[in-house]
Regions:
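Amphipathic alpha-helical/coiled-coil segments positioned at domain termini
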Residues: 188-191, 198-205
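N-terminal leader regions that mediate targeting or early regulatory function
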Residues: 1-186, 198
Length: 205
C-alpha cells in the first residue's frame, strides 16, 4: 500500500467519532490505535521472507525449522478460540459486495471497481467525511483491515476484505489474516506477485 493512502487511513482512524470507536471495539479492532504507531522494520521483514520455504511452509534458520502455527499467534494475542478458519472467496463480484456491505449503488460501485477489488482512495475520501451514513462503521473497519491487517495492492482493496466485514462481529479474523499473510509469502517467493499481501505487523510480531 502506498504511504500517502496509509497516512490518510491513519488520520481517519485517529479522528473517528464515538460511533466509529464503538464499532472498532465491537469488531475487536480497538488495537488499531496502537498498531498504526508501530514502525515497520523493513530490513527485518525482507530478511524473514528470505528464510521462508514456500514448499514446506516453514521458516528455515540454519538447521532449525519454525512453523508459525495459529496457536502460537493466539498465545501472543491471548486468543484461544480457533474453531473456524476463515478464508473468504476471492472471486466475488466487488460491485455486488459494495452494494451489500456499504450500500453503494451499482452505478457508483462500477466506477469504484478495479478488477477483483475497488479503489481504496475513493472509499477513504468518501466515507471519512460521511460520518452520518449508516455504513460508516463498516467502511472504517474495511479501511483498518486494508491498511494494517490485509494489506495488498498499492491503491486497491481486495474483495477478501469486503467479504470479511460481514463476519467480523461473530468470528475471529486472526486465522484468516494469518492465512493470507502466509499465502502472501508464498506468492512473493514464487514470483507470482510483485508486492506482499497480508499483515506486515503480524509477520513482524
Amino acid at each position: 500500500m502506498e504511504l500517502y493512502l496509509l497516512k490518510k487511513i491513519s488520520k481517519w482512524v485517529s479522528h473517528t467519532n464515538d460511533v466509529g470507536r464503538d464499532h472498532r471495539r465491537h469488531v475487536h479492532l480497538s488495537c488499531i490505535i496502537h498498531y498504526r504507531q508501530v514502525k515497520l522494520n523493513l530490513h527485518l521483514l525482507r530478511a524473514v521472507s528470505d528464510f521462508w520455504d514456500h514448499v514446506c511452509h516453514v521458516f528455515h534458520f540454519n538447521r532449525c525449522k519454525l512453523c508459525p502455527m495459529m496457536e502460537e499467534f493466539g498465545a501472543i494475542m491471548r486468543i484461544s478460540n480457533f474453531d473456524q478458519i476463515l478464508l473468504p472467496p476471492k472471486h466475488a463480484d466487488p460491485i455486488l459486495l459494495l452494494d451489500e456491505v456499504l450500500s453503494i449503488p451499482y452505478r457508483f460501485g462500477s466506477l469504484w471497481s478495479m478488477n477483483d477489488g475497488f479503489d481504496s482512495h475513493t472509499l477513504v475520501d468518501h466515507f471519512s467525511k460521511a460520518v452520518d451514513e449508516e455504513c460508516y462503521p463498516e467502511a472504517l473497519a474495511i479501511a483498518a483491515l486494508d491498511g494494517f491487517f490485509l494489506t495488498g495492492d498499492f491503491f486497491k482493496t481486495n474483495v477478501v476484505v469486503l467479504d470479511a466485514i460481514g463476519q467480523m462481529d461473530r468470528e475471529n479474523l486472526v486465522p484468516m489474516i494469518l492465512g493470507e499473510t502466509l499465502n502472501g509469502l508464498d506468492e512473493v517467493k514464487e514470483s507470482m506477485c510483485p508486492y506482499f499481501k497480508g499483515s506486515h505487523l503480524l509477520l513482524q510480531v
